[in-house]
Amino acid sequence: MADAASLRAPLCTEQFGSGAPRGCSAAADGSLQWDGARRWGWLSRAPIAKPGQHAGGGGGPWAALTALSGLRSVLLPQGFPDSVSPDYLPYQLWDSVQAFASSLSGSLATQAVLQGLGVGNAKASVSAATSTWLVKDSTGMLGRIILAWWKGSKLDCNAKQWRLFADILNDVAMFLEIMAPMYPIFFTMTVSTSNLAKCIVGVAGGATRAALTMHQARRNNMADVSAKDSSQETVVNLAGLLVSLLMLPLVSDCPSLSLGCFVLLTALHIYANYRAVRALVLETLNESRLQLVLEHFLQRGEVLEPASANQMEPLWTGFWPSLSLSLGVPLHHLVSSVSELKQLVEGHHEPYLLCWNKSRNQVQVALSQEAGPETVLRAATHGLILGALQEDGPLPGELAELRHQVQADPKKESWILVRETHQVLDTLFPKFLKGLQAAGWKTEKHHLEVDEWRATWPLSPEKKVL
């Protein structure tokens, strides 16, 4: 028979995800007794006891499921928090706040549209209301197609900016719907414009949400993260529906009160959206983040971590960078003669060709068929460094000398400066790339905007492929 010490000695342990482990020891009757059941927090599943047993008692590894752990399994991805990115929880909390505010604003807007269509008005024409509705919907459908064609490939590059833009545009659309009944003669045009904006919101918001889900999913669990996000949104919308049922009767007869509530809810919506987007920490480089990281590297010799760079990334002005950088342009945009091609290729050992227009501060890059992600990063870095030569701020020695040459001799051929910066990058870029990887950036992929053009040209035998 085992003595008391051996009975208390743990036979084995178990844990759920990153939750605290609990041990199992032998009970006096020879059964297994699991301890620590009551200490488990909401970040791990609560143990469930078998019928007739108490939590932590012998005979079963699980205690009764608590309410919080039940909500966790319903609303959060399996394996949370290890199965998602570190910014998942703050983003989802602020996203839920903005969804709640948007739900209430949407109720006010829907009420206004229904009033404008004649709901509750005996003199209203069913055919007129139907025609208005059809015009509104068809306008929105066209807008959805046009935006997907026009900006679809660019939504990944600036997902945070487009996400914020979409939600602000949604507020504008709801404002138009609330104002529409006040001007009956323009009602159809107003609600059609509003629905056009909402369809743009649907495309931009849905696409960027998918991009953010890819970022959040850390165990190839995109479907689970997306499904739980949908569940969270449904719960928030249900709460918004219940509050709307109480709010609408109070404001329905007072347009000014309705408009005042809308303004307050819109302010909350925009603030929560800003906080949600600002909470995101994306580890891939787009042009804005690359420029921030590169500037810091050139000035201080160290690479910003993703958390710091994301906090500094502009959210309102990210669509209009000071430098016009075009990657993957057709080769015929860069050269128009054999001499220009030879001039551009000479001394070019990387699988890209770069042309810099100093007067327009415009950089165009033609990529080789063999160009990989690191080549694109180097080309973008090259272009941003050329742009930095025309701006203020500290630079390393060789680049500071090149800037002095640019300022002293504005007529100096740009292709000469491109070649000289190539030589600087041969030393600088490997250090920069190593620093990016050490800081936590994912350099095997990027979110730089790159067109599909690729080219071949007479190559130096020293050409590199990254």
Swiss-Prot record:
Name of a matching Pfam family: UVB_sens_prot
Main location: membrane
Membrane topology recorded in Swiss-Prot or TrEMBL: Single-pass membrane protein
Modified residues (N-acetylalanine): 2
Transmembrane domains' residue ranges: 245-265
Subcellular localization: Membrane
GO cellular component: membrane
Alphabetically ordered keywords of this record: Acetylation, Membrane, Transmembrane, Transmembrane helix
Domain of life: Eukaryota
Membership in a protein family: Belongs to the RUS1 family.
The protein's name: RUS family member 1
Gene: Rusf1
